[in-house]
């Protein structure tokens, strides 16, 4: 019941004014009821599949950033990461010696004279057969105190399964002493390499989102193409493609009033041009700084595009959401929240999608002391998800996930240890999809 300036509720003492916290909760509930969001539909808590044994590699170095993970068609895992030891920075790669098994000896990707820029995100990694591609940031040789974050974006390649790497090639085609970073890397079904990154070459307050391609297995890079401007300066980009050759790039865009939205732009000509971006979740999150939290994408055989991302929305409550598009990125479904814990802070969501439309989403759950890695799974193209499941045993962070065409998923994350660090990997084989995605027409 409402009176002027008051909200009245029934109690044993009759009608009394609702407390201020109560009014806030009521208003939040009314607002949330109007938002275009599907409430979480969680399947049974039992995992619909089988997790393989955990494989742990120790890294007795001062600092480690990563990992990135890929899994080949035989089930062997690949990792890329950055490490610093005795003031020497290195971009590293390792490949499993058998499906789901131990990792082989690590290989240094960069030349000794090339000093990697120490950044928060792992090198981007693509593995197909004996072809291995890695993008990473080179500390700009002309960096100044006024431009301490200046970098050059580099692409390294191996054609012998990662045993050796060719000298890296430059990705950005401008000479500016600026930042070219927060990159993503993807190889489509026809072998084209697609690269996306954040670029400040125009000198504006907010940088732009740029893309390029390699059509010759990483030997050369095409001219750089600006997709959009007003990009959030440090939320990593994402790039993927569909079975019909459609290419998608995602990033966080800044709108008027410091509103930050996850957006997706699509290319209908294999990455030569891109259409204007489309807002995914309509979060209306006002935040006058960079959240440092990227989006992640995947596409199934039928062409459904899935996006996961982090936002705090209008209620300023941290959350991880998933949405999908069935019209090649023109519009998106209502968003669905995946995190359920009320005592932790969800972070760093990543998604992998197999051809049948089975999804694995992995993210961090941070508390005042603990830091966990959790996973939620859908076997029905996102209709329902399993209750989030904890994967780690010790304080962990930066989880990643990948999948091969056989539907075997690879999970990886970094575990804090003394006196060094550990990278933990694990495979996941899901049960067959109840209704598999049909091939795109």
Language-model region placement:
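Bacterial N-terminal signal peptides that target proteins for export
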Residues: 5, 11-28
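Extracellular, repeat-based ectodomains that mediate carbohydrate processing or recognition
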Residues: 43-441
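Bacterial N-terminal signal peptides
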Residues: 27-37
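Residue-level detector of intrinsically disordered terminal segments
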Residues: 7, 14-17, 36, 102, ...
């Amino acid at each position: 019941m409402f009176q002027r300036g008051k909200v009245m509720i029934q109690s044993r003492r009759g009608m009394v004014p609702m407390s201020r916290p109560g009014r806030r909760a009521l208003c939040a509930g009314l607002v949330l009821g109007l938002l275009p969001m599907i409430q979480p539909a969680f399947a049974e808590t039992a995992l619909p599949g089988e997790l393989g044994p955990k494989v742990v590699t120790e890294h007795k170095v001062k600092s480690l950033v990563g990992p990135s993970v890929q899994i080949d068609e035989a089930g062997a895992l690949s990792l890329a990461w950055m490490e610093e030891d005795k003031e020497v920075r290195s971009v590293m790669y390792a490949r499993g010696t058998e499906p789901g098994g131990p990792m082989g000896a690590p290989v240094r990707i960069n030349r000794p004279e090339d000093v990697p820029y120490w950044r928060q995100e792992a090198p981007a990694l693509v593995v197909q057969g004996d072809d291995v591609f890695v993008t990473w940031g080179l500390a700009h040789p002309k960096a100044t105190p006024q431009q301490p974050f200046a970098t050059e974006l580099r692409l390294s390649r191996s054609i012998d399964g990662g045993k050796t790497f060719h000298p890296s090639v430059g990705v950005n085609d401008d000479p500016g002493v600026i930042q070219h970073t927060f990159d993503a890397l993807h190889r489509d079904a026809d072998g084209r390499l697609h690269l996306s990154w954040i670029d400040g070459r125009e000198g504006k307050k907010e940088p732009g989102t740029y893309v390029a391609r390699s059509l010759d297995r990483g030997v050369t890079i095409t001219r750089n193409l600006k997709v959009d401007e007003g990009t959030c300066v440090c939320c990593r980009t994402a790039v993927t493609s569909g079975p019909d050759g459609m290419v998608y790039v995602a990033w966080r865009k800044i709108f008027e009033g410091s509103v930050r939205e996850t957006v997706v732009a699509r290319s209908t000509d294999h990455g030569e041009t891109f259409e204007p971006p489309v807002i995914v979740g309509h979060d209306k999150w006002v935040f006058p700084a960079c959240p440092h939290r990227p989006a992640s994408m995947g596409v199934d055989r039928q062409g459904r595009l899935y996006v996961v991302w982090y936002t705090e929305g209008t209620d300023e409550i941290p959350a991880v959401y998933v949405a999908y598009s069935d019209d090649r990125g023109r519009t998106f479904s209502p968003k669905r929240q995946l995190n359920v814990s009320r005592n932790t802070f969800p972070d760093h969501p990543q998604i992998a999608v197999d051809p049948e439309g089975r999804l694995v989403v992995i993210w961090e759950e941070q508390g005042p002391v603990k830091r966990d890695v959790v996973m939620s799974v859908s076997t029905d193209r996102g209709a329902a998800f399993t209750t989030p499941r904890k994967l780690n045993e010790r304080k962990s962070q930066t989880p990643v996930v990948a999948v091969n065409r056989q539907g075997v998923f690879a999970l990886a994350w970094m575990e804090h240890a003394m006196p060094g660090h550990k990278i933990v990997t694990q495979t996941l084989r899901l049960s067959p999809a109840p209704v598999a995605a049909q091939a795109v027409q």
